[in-house]
Amino acid sequence: MIVSKPLVFIYRAIAAIVRIFPVKFVTPIQNFVARLVLNFSKERKFLVRRHLNRTYEKNLPAKDSEEKVKKTFQTYARYWVDSARMQGLSDFQIDSGFTVEGFEHIENAWEAGVGPILALPHLGGWEWAGRWLTCRPNYEVSVVVEPQKPRELFDFMVKYRESFGMNVIPLGPEAGKAVINAIKKNHVVCLLCDRDIEGKGVKVHFFGEETTIPAGPATLAIRTGAKIIPVAVYQKKNSHHAVVCPPISSERSGKFREDVERMSQEIVTVLESLIQKEPEQWHLMQPNWPSDFKALKDIRSGRI
């Protein structure tokens, strides 16, 4: 508690500062902080380089690697600054700074009366997808969020999202029921799908290696009839741009588990193409494949 309260205070202070000062003033500071984190986070830097190498299909020239790792940390710093700035923006300002292609896929699914599932990677400004949708007439938005530590910061972020009209569903044992209820109410549900935090997901081939992703999106789609729509939100110079892809087919073609695996693999295949458009905006700084854990063990033991 002693540590967590100052963290919440610091985040509130940062949010207040970025709302006051113009982007051109804040950007050099956020890039400086990104550089500090880069220099003092050996393991994160190592993992980001590995993940970038995957997205470039192991064709990333060594001379370009350092600059692209640096850019990844910079875009991640911008994600946090933009999220803090979002708190002070009106619906008009959000809408003015957001462009989207393929929105008809969300509209068509929503008009069918069963809330669609937006499958997103940790890419660019993913928070803006849900925030922008709250600006649209008639749309209710539910977001599934990962637990954060300390608890006070997590609670603060939940209240922050709820202040925009979002229905926040914490990831956990009761999340499935809550998401099903949201889908039945025709909410647009936002799910991050490129990391299996709980380690109980379905096996897929993702950027050349087998790993797991959450089985939730495919499972929920089969049980409710919801459309799964892959979406990515990219950072642009002074705005954000969303790409909405056609829905993944949720028609049954085999046993339940087989259909979950098939749909999950289709999700991953689309996410790969979305990530490869802007690899340096993929904010995956944790081990995500079995070989990552072995590599981390080697680096900790000094073998790398």
List each model region and its residues:
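Non-catalytic C-terminal accessory region of glycerolipid acyltransferases
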Residues: 2, 40, 58, 62-63, ...
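Membrane-anchoring hydrophobic helices of lipid-metabolizing enzymes
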Residues: 1-120, 155-156, 163
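Active-site metal-coordination segments of metallo-dependent hydrolases
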Residues: 45, 150-151, 211-214
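Catalytic core of membrane glycerolipid acyltransferases/transacylases, capturing the structured
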Residues: 112-173, 199-202
